Amino acid sequence: MIRELDWKELKYFAKPQKPTKVKKGKKGETDDKPLELIGQERAAEALEFGLQIKAQGYHIYVCGATGTGRTTFAREYAKAKAATEAVPPDLCYVYNFKNPKCPKLLRLPAGMGKRLKEDMNELIVRLSEELPRTFADKTYEQKKNEIIKVLKTKQDEIIKEMSVEARKHDFEVKNSNSGIFFVPIIEGETITEEQFESLSSEQKEIITKKSESIQQRASEALREIKDYEKTTKKEVDELDFALGLFTVGHHMNDIIETFADEPELLEYLKAVKEDILDNLVDFVSEEAEEEESIQAFMPWYNKKSNEDNLTKYKINLLTDNSELTGAPVVVDYNPSYPNLVGEVEYDNEFGNLSTDFMKIKPGLLHKANGGYLILQAQDILGSPHAWETLRRTLITEKIITEPLREYTTGVAVSGVKPEPIPVDIKIIIIGGGYYYDVLYTYDDYFEKLFKIRVDFDYEMKMNDQNIAELAKFIARNTSEANPFAPCAVASIIEYATRIAERKDRLTTRFNRLAEILTEAVVWANMDKSDKVLSKHVKKAIEKRDYRLNMYEEKLSEMLEEDSIMVSTEGEKIGQINGLAVLDTGDHVFAKPSRITATAYMGKAGIVNIEKEADMSGSIHDKGVQVMIGYLGQTYAKDFPLSLSSRICFEQNYNGIDGDSASSTELYAVLSALAEIPIRQDIAITGSMNQHGEIQPIGGATYKVEGFFDLCKTRGLTGNQGVIIPTRNIRDLVLKDEVIEAVKQKKFHIYPIAHIDEGFPILMNLPAGEFPYPADTVHGKVFRKLRSYHRKVMKE
């Protein structure tokens, strides 16, 4: 008995209902659960579990289709968990007085880094103001001059003694910027260099010997002067230190007292205090004007101001967590190498590159340290060296900030080398299954680092709870100025089943639904309607399809013009209408295709012309082999098959794969064998196994609509229709015009569960049971194959 689907079986008919208003709370939340998490119970459980584990290697990969709210899902759950956790410490880099090229890391309680930075900046300002005043005091100048006066007196005494000694040896002492030297005296007067050269050799020799004697005494005198200078400098330094200690100690002690509970910080502050006292000149130097005058005529001169010297006392606050109330949650879409681990910036002044610890800039790993970093798989795999850098960080548990050139080549680049930062972070990567498979297959560390996989479902069950949640979603994403009527809500629910491609499922790709909500509001406004009605939702869907279906329309034109030959009336032997689904990325549709078969006596078996031309995939080739198995199982238990048959997808130039046409091809082969014509106003789709059972296929809705559109274009006769697998009935979510045509008996949809059920529809003959009567399809095929075998045996 031929079964035909009733129009009520062709989609889910939603009941009109009002969008459910939600209580205003945190963004994205309803009365009971965040809207983006509807239907994601498995994912929620997996993510909650992953967030609880703090052990190394338990990072998270959220896997699912785009548009299902994966990022929002991960962010909201991470925020909820982060809110219960401690605020991580501030990260600061400070000057390393023992090794200036390697800035020192300070980890301080949240908020303390900001205060330290402010206190140190204030210290620099105050000392820059007070120390010059202190050292400009008259009392200080008097004490300093007294010390210097003693030195001057000693210098004068030593030089005077040297002058007397030199006179005894006929020399006069001369003092210059380059030091002390002696000029010979002849006949009571000093001589010039030219006069010395004009002297005889004997005179020169006498003067030279005298000079050697006096030079020895001069060396002793110079040593005495230097000793006095050292003593004087020490006394001046002690004076400066004592004076500076009062001013510096006053301010530094306040800072030290503030941070008395931080031993590591106290050690740094002690080093700061010692360095300031050793370099008081940096606060009171008067060399700035001189350097500015030099730079006026030598622009390339690298002026180093007092401010540059004082930079070493500043604090480079990498992360300021003073405003946080829990652990940080960072979401980013540009995880480049420098954005991940930070970078060291350089100043370029006339080709002279310079840097210091204050030019170390934080990256995402710094900002998210102690919390959660959410990245997109596509972004991190598409950015050079980003994945390798993230992997290294997770393996070593350290953030290493170094120039990219140094990381990639191993060649050291001159500059600062910051102390690595211990990392305590949970990485959440958002991506599709493809990227997960790539990482799992080609990176040995991936499964060791990302042990939690969160599978995000693209659909949810059709039940009252999920329908209610979907109604809340509609309310959440629409305004009171453009309310959705109950009929419009029903249309959105029906559209959700169409995206899911099942009557008993609702899509979780809420971005697709949100787009239709937005566009439906626009159509309602253009219609000057105070409410969004069902017709506005349907128009939004229709117009969206229209914007995307140009390629589909071009193929439809070719079918209408018979450039692509597909018959929709009459009967033909060895010719049948198949259906293929095409996906252009943002639009899916089906194209009817003519499949032909020839059959004749021989031993070649069934030859797939597409395979011979290297235009078929392995799954399609498997379908052909399944068909051969069916023929042998059904007809050749008592004799071998003596058959040659060729099957072909006509006008196929792009290749083909999949087994959804295996039953279609079988009908064409059997038609050619038994010479039974096939109705051309029927198209068929369905996979099969070797026992003739019809298996479900994908895209059933689009395939039915594809053949319907062709028949509608050529004119509906009332006899046209499509055969689909029985197991695909639940997948049908057809357009209203198809449903209306079925309702009016202008178009027909026949479900079948076995090959035998299709014969009465396609060939107007029963299948027949063994021993296969002559007036059945099996009987005609069986007799033809047996006659082939007998003829072959006679040969």
Which residues make up each language-model segment?
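Conserved ASCE/P-loop NTPase catalytic core
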Residues: 2-440, 445, 451-467, 471-485, ...
